[in-house]
Amino acid sequence: MFRPVLKVRPSFSYPYSIVSSRSVRLASTATANANTAAATSTVAAHGTQETPFDFEGHFESELAKKRLDKSYRYFNNINRLAKEFPLAHRQLEDDKVTVWCSNDYLALSKNPQVLDAMRKTIDKYGAGAGGTRNIAGHNIPTMRLEAELAALHKKEGALVFSSCYVANDAVISLLGQKVKDLVIFSDELNHASMIVGIKHANRPKHIFRHNDLAQLEEMLQMYPKSTPKLIAFESVYSMAGSVADINKICDLAEKYGALTFLDEVHAVGLYGPHGAGVAEHCDFEAHRVAGIATPPQGDNGRLRTVMDRVDMITGTLGKSFGTVGGYVAASSKLIDWVRSYAPGFIFTTTLPPAVMAGAAEAIRFQRSHLNLRQDQQRHTAYVKKGLHDLGIPVIPNPSHIVPVLIGNPDLAKQASDILMEKHRIYVQAINFPTVSRGTERLRITPTPGHTNDLSDILIAAVDDVFNELQLPRIRDWEMQGGLLGVGDKNFVPEPNLWTEEQLSFSNEDLNSNVFEPVIDQLEVSSGVKL
């Protein structure tokens, strides 16, 4: 039988002063223990007598509120098929639908070159990065991708994040935390990621009406030019398809001493001769001629292009580039600063090497394939015209987004459900809080793969749903005075961002330097050595 061995400590003689001080400490400890015991008994009494907080009941109550205000979300099981784009299957593989609302705008998620790059990388480097950028997660695919992104936007550096939500939150909040007295100016329709970043920045903020630059200027005038300022806005606003006047915002930023923060999430891949976004598209011809190089500066030494003038550009890898992740492109100093201070970048595992490699290949491919952007634009125009000719209310905009106005959350969901079940077409209903109440809509996003034949089927199906549900058409909105430009006789539509001349160019009209360019790794991706 096992018996524990008792070890007896040897007896020592201590000096009187040590014994006395130890006795005092023991007495104090005893008193403290008595007080603690009394407090503990009180706590114990609370623990046995009081009813604990009902967490499950609280969760149920909060969910009930979402259901009551029609903002509860139902997820559709959609499995997009790489070899049958734009088809997807639902739970059963023979239950196929045509997807009309994906943000895979150029269908690069199925591109053979992108997939091949990912396969080769996963075979060579494995499934995961193995750590954060600082600990075992910094690698060649990451550095190559950041170099590609910087080259795309013609900036000194770029930094990849796990998503653009994280990128927007991390950069904006860091600016607020580190730039004393910063004041932030934000468009009212900015994405949730920017709104959260502004909240985390914990700095004074001013929200200006959507694309109302007169009001923005009034707000900027409230502060001395020496006060640090940040103007946060998007190029293409994803739910309405409206577009910011980037050049004029840059004018205001220079006039009043502000940094510009531009979210190009729904524009990269789709605008500009090389897919860098609306900022590049503003100087389409200059960038087309220069190719991957920076267009020459003007005679007065001032930067010529709008893309040059924007201080920070954020974007996503998960839409036009067909993979996942987000990024910011900016000056080398700003990128190094974010790399060194932003918790959202520092304390998270690096994206898998295969994802980085696939995204880099997607950027290279789309840069030299102008036809992808042009086909997407042509298909969008075809759908918009077909719907408009039938009196179906499309919120007017100059971009690739096709928002079909419904104006009621229940009817928007019913319309989406009928399209799915009756017509085998998937178009997601967009309700509050993504859009304001009373402006609920269906959001359609054509791609290069949505041919005119598929578009005709979609247009007929939407028309059938409008008839079945007796949904308001353009003439009905006219009788109500119009909404969001639909049925508004005083509304002046903006011309499409793509001109007929731009749509007439071919891939061969691009500068030869965009085909298989050699892009060097950036020092700032690893850290700048002094």
Swiss-Prot record:
Active site (record annotation): 319
UniProt-listed Enzyme Commission number(s): 2.3.1.37
Catalytic activity, reaction form: succinyl-CoA + glycine + H(+) = 5-aminolevulinate + CO2 + CoA
Subcellular location: Mitochondrion matrix
Domain of life: Eukaryota
InterPro entries: 4pyrrol_synth_NH2levulA_synth, Aminotrans_II_pyridoxalP_BS, Aminotransferase_I/II_large, AON_synthase_class-II, PyrdxlP-dep_Trfase, PyrdxlP-dep_Trfase_major, PyrdxlP-dep_Trfase_small
Subunit text: Homodimer.
Stated name of the protein: 5-aminolevulinate synthase, mitochondrial
